[in-house]
UniProtKB/Swiss-Prot annotation:
Recognizes the DNA sequence 5'-ATTAA-3'. Transcriptional repressor. Regulates the differentiation of both endothelial and blood cells. Probably plays a role in the proliferation of vascular endothelial cells during blood vessel development. Establishes anterior identity at two levels; acts early to enhance canonical wnt-signaling by repressing expression of tle4, and acts later to inhibit nodal-signaling by directly targeting nodal/nr1 and nodal2/nr2. May play a role in liver development. Induces heart development. Residues 249-263 have a biased composition (Acidic residues). It comes from the Eukaryota. Transmembrane segments: none annotated. The keyword Acetylation does not apply. This is Hematopoietically-expressed homeobox protein hhex.
Amino acid sequence: MQYQHPSSSALGLSVPLYAPTPLQPVHPTPFYIDDILGRSSASNGTPALPTPTLPSPNSSFTSLVATYRTPIYEPTPIHPAFTHPGAALAASYGASTYANPLYPFSRPVSEYTHALIRHDTLGKPLLWSPFIQRPLHKRKGGQVRFSNDQTIELEKKFETQKYLSPPERKRLAKMLQLSERQVKTWFQNRRAKWRRLKQENPQGNKKDETESLENICEESQERCLSAEQKSRESSLDEPTSSPTSQETLDSEVSDDSDQEVDIEGDKGFYNCAH
C-alpha cells in the first residue's frame, strides 16, 4: 500500500512509505504515519485525511513535515529517545520554547548575544571582537614618577630659572640621575601649570615673582661679596714692592745726595755780593 499525503503534492515531494521492518518504539507516539493511519482506519474503516488547520509549534503536522524530510524506515533499530526528529536537537541544544526541528537555533537569541558581550573590570560592556580585545600597546615614554628629592631639586631650579639651556639641562639630568627628555618634559609641564596659576591668581603670582626676584638679588649679592673677598685676599698675599724697584730707588737717592751740581752764575753772584 502506498500513501501520499496531500501536503506532499503541494510541496512537490514524493516519498515512498514502504516499511519492510517498521520500528515499534517502547512508548507509542502519534508522530508516525502508521500510527495515524492505523487509528483513523480502525475508527472509520477508510483512511481519513486531516483537516487543513493552522499548525501549532507542537502539533503533529510539523512532525509530519519533518518525517517527509527523513525516511521513516531504518535497517537497524535506533534508540527510542531519538525517534522524534527534534530529540537530537533538543539533546544537543537543550530544552527551549521552540521544541521543533524547523527552528534549529533552539536557544533564545539573547543567550547568543550575551555570549558576545563581555564586561570589563569597570563594569562597562564591551562587544567582543578579536580586534577589539587585542592588548593595547603602552606608550614608549610612560609616566615617570619622580622621587621627593628629585622633585624638590627641580622645583628649586624652576623658581630661579624657568627655561634651561641644553648644557644646564644636561648637567641637571646628570645630577638627578634622569634623562634630558624627562627634565625637559617636567619643565614644560611645570611652565604650563605656572601659566595656568598665573591666570587664575595674578596677585599671588606677583608675590611669588617678587620673592623670586629678591632671592635672585640676594644670591647675586652673595656672589659679588664672595668675589670681592677673594680679590682682597689675593691682594694681601702679594708683596707691596719688589726688591728690584727698592734698589733702584735707593740708588737714585744716594746719587742725588753724594754728587754736587755746579749751578751757572753762582760765582758771579757771590763776587757781586762781596
